[in-house]
Amino acid sequence: MKYIEIDEELYRFIASKTERIGESASDILRRLLNLSVENVDVSLPTDISHPSLESQSPVNRHPVFDQAKAAVEKVIADQNSANEHYPVDEDIASSTSIDFDAMVSQHLLSQQKGAVGRFMYLLSSLESTAGSDFDKVLNVQGKGRLYFARSKQALLNSSKSSNPKEIASSGFWVTTNNNTAKKQTILTEVLEHLGCDSERAKSIAEHI
């Protein structure tokens, strides 16, 4: 058994991937790297290596260490870059009865005023198509602020500059003070929450 030092971020990440009681860090890393889990001698060595106090020549490191470190750091980087992406509920069906293609009318889109108008038109069209499932939009939220609510005041309480607008006469309100890219992201998340596949959702949102 070899002992190495890792930084705090790597330690927390590895610990967060524990799937069962008693699983060791080696077991977790082997699973993440798709390596077979082997029985290893866990007896403590006479001398424990402290890499931070020793020469860090790459030649002296076991190649699996570099592979594991690179893999874990890549996963952490990917997760950090995706922080703005709001998770879709796990209980959402992969497909629903909603005809997402039917909600887009090029003729009606062309009559809307700016990105806000197109954003509101697409949400209104989706609301009329989704029916009672539309309340899933309430699950789409930003960091510390609401994007959808059942009242204008709720959005204003979340952000004074939210510029809330009601989606048709549905009783649902949406913030509209975001730039076009953010509106597209919000609509994409709404569509995914309602069962639309990711690629189609992005394609529809590009109409904003």
UniProtKB/Swiss-Prot annotation:
Which Gene Ontology cellular-component terms appear in the entry? cytoplasm
Output one GO BP term.
negative regulation of DNA-templated DNA replication initiation
Q: Which UniProt keywords apply?
A: Cytoplasm, DNA replication inhibitor, DNA-binding
Question: What GO molecular function annotations does the UniProt record carry, in alphabetical order?
Answer: DNA binding
Q: Which Pfam families match?
A: SeqA, SeqA_N
Q: Where in the cell is it found?
A: Cytoplasm
InterPro entries per the record?
Arc_rbn_hlx_hlx, Ribbon_hlx_hlx, SeqA, SeqA_DNA-bd_C, SeqA_DNA-bd_C_sf, SeqA_N
Q: Name the principal localization, coarsely classed.
A: cytoplasm
Return the annotated region ranges for Interaction with DNA: 115-116
Q: Which domain of life is it from?
A: Bacteria
**Function summary:** Negative regulator of replication initiation, which contributes to regulation of DNA replication and ensures that replication initiation occurs exactly once per chromosome per cell cycle. Binds to pairs of hemimethylated GATC sequences in the oriC region, thus preventing assembly of replication proteins and re-initiation at newly replicated origins. Repression is relieved when the region becomes fully methylated.
Quote the subunit structure annotation. Answer: Homodimer. Polymerizes to form helical filaments.
What family is this protein classified in? Belongs to the SeqA family.
Return the protein name.
Negative modulator of initiation of replication
Q: Which organism is it from?
A: Shewanella frigidimarina (strain NCIMB 400)
